[in-house]
Amino acid sequence: MRHSVLSISFAVALFLECYTPSTAIPIGKMDDVALEQDTLDSLLRVEVSENSPDSVRGRSSKIVLLADSGLWMNLNRGLPLYKLIAAAAGPDRALTLDRREAGQDLSPSISIVRRDTMRCMVGRVYRPCWEV
């Protein structure tokens, strides 16, 4: 019942809006419209010149800063514990050194620098994943 009343009222509103007859403006009226537009433009220019930075210097100005609330959350409280620990340890501690076994590679002296990433199982394989 509610959907039918709403759809009928919407259809009537659209029909009345589209059915209003359009009228032509005579040439004499056209000059008046242009004159009104010119006066509006001049008033806006006066208002803009009054609010110019030169005239604001005498008055006290307010600075408003807007920020996304997600930025504030991620500053300290929103980070997971392991990220906070890695950030507190410093950039040199964030990377770990792993050595390969002698049987895996021909040159065991080469060290591999690997980031500490989480591993998620995708299908049958563990892949690196990121926190959502």
From Swiss-Prot:
- Which BP terms in the Gene Ontology apply to this protein? chemical synaptic transmission; neuropeptide signaling pathway
- Describe, from its UniProt entry, the tissues in which this protein is expressed: Pituitary gland. Produced in neurons of lateral basal hypothalamus which project both to the brain and to the neural lobe of the pituitary gland from where MCH is released.
| Acetylation listed as a keyword | no
Which keywords belong to this entry?
Cleavage on pair of basic residues, Disulfide bond, Hormone, Neuropeptide, Signal
- Give any Gene Ontology cellular component: synapse
> Which cysteines are cross-linked by disulfides?
120-129
Signal peptide feature range = 1-24
Highest taxon listed in the record's lineage: Eukaryota
What Gene Ontology molecular-function terms does this entry list? melanin-concentrating hormone activity; type 1 melanin-concentrating hormone receptor binding
Q: Which Pfam families match?
A: Pro-MCH
Q: Which InterPro entries match?
A: Prepro-melanin_conc_hormone (IPR005456)
Does the record's keyword annotation contain GTP-binding? no
Give the protein family. Answer: Belongs to the melanin-concentrating hormone family.
Function, in words: Plays a role in skin pigmentation by antagonizing the action of melanotropin alpha. Induces melanin concentration within the melanophores. May participate in the control of the hypothalamo-pituitary adrenal gland axis by inhibiting the release of ACTH.
Name this protein carries in UniProt: Pro-MCH 1
What organism is recorded for this protein? Answer: Oncorhynchus mykiss
Starting at the broadest rank, the lineage of the source organism is: Eukaryota, Metazoa, Chordata, Craniata, Vertebrata
